[in-house]
């Protein structure tokens, strides 16, 4: 079903239809399209286009469709729909009949796709932040283990000065820190909602676009309808961030390939990230790293292609803009995969400390120390530089290191050299002297490792903000609880109940907007239940639920509660939070009284899980 048939008297040529259709790649926006449609149905309700009964019917059908898509996303590809918007509308009409045709009132595919894409970018961006964090954390852990492992530092691929393996790791941690910052900034800039901008001139209905934006989890609505449907800055910015980060990953891969080579033999990669040769049985090839290096080009290509596509477009939507998605999807998928592989390479890495130390002692890497020694004796640096250069030539001629020259031989180059020169030519001295901030001295490296560890820990603690609920949150809580109750995931709660139990609720926040909630209901037996866990549409899969559950479990622990349980149809989620399966028959009868309100009470498919806080305390005390 096309969404634009009335103007045409002839059917589209099948070759044009195949050329024009985008469902084969924009099917990835299905969840976002459904979430956006639910929010739009609420907006239409607010201006009287839909009745409350119609809106509820549409929302239930869209939620059903969302679950179907989550279970089998590839079912979409079996359709001949033009794009994901057409497919969603087709499915909706098949569920609710002509009512489904009312949903597109006041909305254009132009603002619809712009909204879908921003929702997808926001969700994918959060996953990329997590991937960056994991990679940095893995590298910091390796750095902790190798603070004293000496490594030759290179310039022009020539041995230059000794560093440590930890210092080398932290150099890339800094690069990825900048990537994290750039991505965070990009996500803030795209945190505006274009829905309600229509085709280009805005919607003709008096919709509260700020409320609509907040319902979708955006910070605010966009300010200009023409810009809203024209804008693809966020696509190019995310590709740009990906390109810079892939550059860092490629440089990392190149370093590790060199260090892993037989000529260097500084590191050995695990079998899990290497492959062999079909002909040469001795080979162990660093394929994961080579692919990271190779895939960098495709991300650059996607960015260049997108910029060339947009550079001469007039304002508003043009069909050229359909080309934004394939490159974006591929670029961000590639970036995510490469970060995962890089972290995996560090997971099983072995560092040959003896070999790295041996290499660091070669190549006259202590020549700069001798020059600094001469400067300390009163010789101008430029002259000292020349003297040491001549000394290096002399040592090369004798086939020895600088520190292996006798005092008499060294004094042939400068008579200010004395016996104390040998102390400053050691590797330990070379490292120790670099004690300024950011240097390679043991103290500075230990400080840098500690600071990196603290930054990552602070980031983890502030990624999702959870706080006690307030009465000012009631409107949002009521909407979220009703949403998941309609989905059949939670029991319904009246507004009066929510007000009465507000002290038991915790909420997650994003830019001051509530994005998730749950309550901790305490029984008089020292037992507590997590209830009414729900995440705002568009925010699932971004750590909100985990953060709320952990917050409530910590609260229960502080209250000396012995056990926390939950009844759920998604046991996998709670098992990731350390909950274990239990039997519903072991729960007190009064726990199950609320089941009388459940529409599925006669065909219950909920699973009981629990976390025993007393056992955790005992285990921790044994460890201590």
From Swiss-Prot:
Residues 467-624 are annotated as: Probable acetyltransferase. The lineage of its organism: Bacteria, Pseudomonadati, Pseudomonadota, Gammaproteobacteria, Vibrionales. It is found in: Cytoplasm. It comes from Vibrio parahaemolyticus serotype O3:K6 (strain RIMD 2210633). Pathway: Amino-acid biosynthesis; L-arginine biosynthesis; L-arginine from L-ornithine and carbamoyl phosphate: step 3/3. One of its GO terms (biological process) is L-arginine biosynthetic process. Its main location: cytoplasm. The keyword Nucleotidyltransferase does not apply. One of its GO terms (cellular component) is cytosol. Keywords: Acyltransferase, Amino-acid biosynthesis, Arginine biosynthesis, Cytoplasm, Lyase, Multifunctional enzyme, Transferase. It comes from the Bacteria. Residues 464-614 form the N-acetyltransferase domain. Residues 1-466 are annotated as: Argininosuccinate lyase. It catalyses: 2-(N(omega)-L-arginino)succinate = fumarate + L-arginine. Transmembrane segments: none annotated. Disulfide bonds: none annotated. The keyword Acyltransferase applies. Gene3D superfamilies: 3.40.630.30, Fumarase/aspartase (C-terminal domain), Fumarase/aspartase (Central domain), Fumarase/aspartase (N-terminal domain). SUPFAM superfamilies: Acyl-CoA N-acyltransferases (Nat), L-aspartase-like. In the N-terminal section; belongs to the lyase 1 family. Argininosuccinate lyase subfamily. PROSITE patterns: FUMARATE_LYASES (PS00163), GNAT (PS51186). Its EC number is 4.3.2.1, 2.3.1.-. This is Bifunctional protein ArgH.
């Amino acid at each position: 079903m096309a969404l634009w048939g009335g103007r045409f008297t002839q059917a589209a040529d099948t070759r044009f239809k195949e050329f024009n259709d985008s469902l084969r790649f924009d099917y990835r926006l299905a969840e976002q399209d459904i979430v956006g449609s639910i929010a739009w149905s609420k907006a239409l309700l607010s201006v009287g286009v839909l009745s409350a009964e119609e809106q509820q019917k549409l929302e239930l059908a869209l939620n059903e469709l969302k679950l179907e898509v989550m279970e089998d996303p590839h079912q979409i590809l079996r359709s001949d729909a033009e794009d994901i918007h057409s497919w969603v509308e087709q499915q909706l009409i098949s569920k609710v009949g002509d009512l489904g045709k009312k949903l597109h009132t006041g909305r254009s595919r132009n603002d619809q796709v712009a909204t879908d894409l921003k929702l997808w970018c926001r969700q994918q961006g959060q996953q990329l932040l997590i991937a960056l964090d994991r990679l940095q954390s893995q590298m910091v852990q390796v750095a902790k283990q190798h603070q004293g492992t000496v490594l030759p530092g290179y310039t022009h691929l020539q041995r230059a000065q000794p560093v440590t393996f930890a210092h080398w790791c932290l150099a890339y941690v800094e690069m990825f820190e900048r990537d994290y910052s750039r991505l965070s900034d990009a996500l803030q800039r795209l945190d505006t909602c274009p829905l309600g901008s229509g085709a280009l001139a805005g919607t003709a209905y008096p919709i509260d676009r700020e409320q609509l934006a907040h319902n979708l989890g955006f910070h605010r609505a966009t300010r200009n309808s023409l810009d809203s449907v024209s804008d693809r800055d966020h696509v190019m910015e995310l590709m740009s961030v990906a390109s810079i980060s892939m550059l860092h990953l490629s440089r990392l891969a190149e370093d590790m390939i060199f260090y892993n080579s037989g000529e260097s033999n500084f590191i050995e990669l695990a079998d899990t990230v290497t492959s062999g040769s079909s002909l040469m049985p001795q080979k162990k090839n660093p394929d994961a790293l080579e692919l990271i290096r190779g895939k960098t080009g495709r991300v650059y290509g996607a960015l260049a292609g997108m910029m060339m596509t947009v550079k001469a477009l007039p304002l508003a939507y043009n069909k050229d803009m359909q080309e934004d998605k394939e490159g974006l999807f591929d670029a961000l998928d590639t970036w995510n995969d490469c970060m995962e592989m890089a972290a995996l390479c560090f997971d099983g890495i072995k560092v040959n400390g003896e070999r790295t130390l041996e290499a660091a002692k070669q190549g006259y890497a202590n020549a700069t120390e001798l020059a600094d020694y001469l400067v300390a004796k009163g010789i101008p640096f430029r002259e000292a530089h020349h003297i040491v250069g001549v000394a290096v030539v002399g040592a090369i001629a004798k086939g020895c290191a600088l520190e292996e020259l006798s005092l008499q031989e060294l004094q042939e180059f400068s008579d200010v050299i004395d016996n104390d020169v040998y102390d400053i030519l050691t590797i330990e001295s070379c490292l120790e002297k670099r004690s300024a901030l950011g240097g390679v001295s043991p103290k500075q490296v230990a400080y840098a490792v500690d600071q990196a560890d603290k930054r990552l820990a602070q980031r983890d603690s502030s990624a999702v903000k959870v706080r006690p609920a307030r009465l000012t949150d009631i409107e949002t809580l009521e909407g979220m609880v009703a949403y998941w109750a309609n989905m059949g995931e939670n029991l319904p709660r009246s507004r009066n109940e929510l007000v009465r139990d507000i002290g038991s609720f915790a909420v997650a926040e994003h830019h001051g907007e509530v994005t998730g909630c749950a309550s901790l209901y305490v029984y008089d037996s020292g037992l507590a239940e997590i209830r009414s866990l729900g995440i705002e549409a568009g925010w699932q899969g971004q750590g909100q639920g985990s953060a709320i559950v952990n917050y409530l479990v910590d609260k229960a622990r502080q209250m000396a509660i012995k056990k926390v349980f939950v009844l759920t149809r998604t046991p996998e989620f709670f098992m990731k939070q350390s909950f274990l399966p239990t039997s519903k028959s072991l729960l007190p009868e009064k726990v199950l009284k609320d089941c009388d309100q459940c529409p599925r009470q006669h065909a219950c498919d909920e699973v009981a899980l629990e976390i025993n806080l007393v056992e955790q305390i005992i285990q921790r005390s044994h460890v201590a």
